[in-house]
């Protein structure tokens, strides 16, 4: 598929992202995307910054997993440290969703931090149901403030490694 480029006489190949397809249709269970394709699909500099900060702070590499979960099916990116899940990220067009599970050990501290977080993160936290003294937060990372809030929540789960 081709689309007209910015120059009056130049055509350029349309990427999968330009087509406007859902992530789980673009990359099926047998067709894992590369990290470059993930970045192209998200098409937001916050993704590269988030990924870099998590990798650096925890000295980890993400891995991809295919989910059939009805909430967010398709390929996702998982970050784990010492067997503990830090977060799972779901690529979206123009942003990404970060799933952070606030466990029973982190819940009180997270509640104390909430007034310092964005109104959006506070609302998601407040509206999330608590089960087994856990809250599952699906946070749409669309701006830097939300990204920083997500990183602070991850840090509650596992303290980052000092440089």
Please annotate each region the language model reported:
Residues 4-163:
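Charge-dense, helix-prone N-terminal extensions
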């Amino acid at each position: 598929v081709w689309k007209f480029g910015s120059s009056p006489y130049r055509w350029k190949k349309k990427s999968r992202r330009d087509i406007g397809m859902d992530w789980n249709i673009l990359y099926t269970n047998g067709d894992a995307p590369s990290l470059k394709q993930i970045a192209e699909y998200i098409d937001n500099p916050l993704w590269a910054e988030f990924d870099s900060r998590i990798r650096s702070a925890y000295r980890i590499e993400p891995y991809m997993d295919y989910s059939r979960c009805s909430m967010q099916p398709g390929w996702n990116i998982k970050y784990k440290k010492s067997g503990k899940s830090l977060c799972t990220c779901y690529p979206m067009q123009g942003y990404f969703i970060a799933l952070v599970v606030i466990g029973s050990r982190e819940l009180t501290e997270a509640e104390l931090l909430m007034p310092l977080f964005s109104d959006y993160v506070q609302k998601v936290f407040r509206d999330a149901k608590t089960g087994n003294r856990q809250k599952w937060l699906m946070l749409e990372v669309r701006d830097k403030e939300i990204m920083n809030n997500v990183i602070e929540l991850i840090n509650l789960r596992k303290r980052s490694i000092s440089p």
